[in-house]
């Protein structure tokens, strides 16, 4: 199995665009970007890559448009996100490398007889791996010697969380589950060339969901910072993260086992590998999970040839649009979050289809108070109000989605309102 590492210091470099046979004109590409971004501000081209260009809107938002006529016109877009060509967002850079090497094809649209035409993004958090998320992670002064590759990493107060634990933390905050973990776990890290054992007793911890913020960029109190730092650190230890200052790495199996054994998620959850499924089946499994209100933890990996290691990335797919693009939360403080073509990444020069996986049926187990939608430990009329507000707005902040699935069919919808009212009338 391949160790997943999130490189934190390797920025994306801009590449010279070659001449492409049958390439779209710049004017046409600019017009396409303008249509998808709307009229919120002036649209300008900010980056060029082989086969594609990136357009940014002054009022916020960006679009990545294909240069090759045979490719889908819009490969990715964000209605309000910012595109930074120097970003070291590892998940986004993985997608960028994969899409450049993939033979493009028509998108796989959601089947209207089985799925909604679109699902708005489920994840509201814009969390990452640095402050305050890494406050409880260890300080490590040991790392592989990368100076011969021209990579020099500065000292940091605490090691970064790692992309796997960061995705786990956002995922658990979405469900606001659990209140506390199960069992304990130890990991060994290296400090001053010595092994140091870190142990977490998950049973003794309480996760302070109410003091966690969806976005920490606007400032936070010590209590708010500590609440999310504890969750991230516990996720990292539970997943047996291997830390160096280069990043934090773990395995898909470790993440899955941590979610089941230490955080009480459904024990029938599993990790699927893309080569075992045809394109339509793969994408429709994503649509099905999202249409039931469950985000999809996703993984991708590639090779960093400079360093000579396989690099893994974990992120969350939490929505899709009517054109077959899925919404991705990269776990990088909101940077480049938006809609992306994942279906195209099936064959490439590095066989990116072999290097993709997703977690299915990963949601809280049944040991929650059914109907306690607002998470106050009681089931009453306020839970009905909270559930209706969620269904109307799509805003899951403060909503215990595990408890909101009152009828137990795996979907949170209007039938759960009826089931909740029946529950109140019969108890």
Model-predicted segments: where are they?
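Residue-level detector of buried hydrophobic side-chain packing
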Residues: 163, 259, 317-319, 328, ...
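Positively charged n-region of N-terminal signal peptides that target proteins for export
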Residues: 1-5
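Bacterial N-terminal signal peptides
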Residues: 6-18
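Boundary at the C-terminal end of the N-terminal hydrophobic targeting segment
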Residues: 19-23
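Cellulosome-associated attachment modules in secreted, modular CAZymes
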Residues: 365-427
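Active-site-adjacent structural segments surrounding the nucleophilic cysteine of cysteine proteases
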Residues: 50, 71-249
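Active-site-adjacent substructure of cysteine-protease-like catalytic cores
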Residues: 42-59, 257, 261-329
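Cys-His-centered catalytic/binding microenvironment captured across papain-like cysteine peptidases
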Residues: 24-47, 57, 63, 69-131, ...
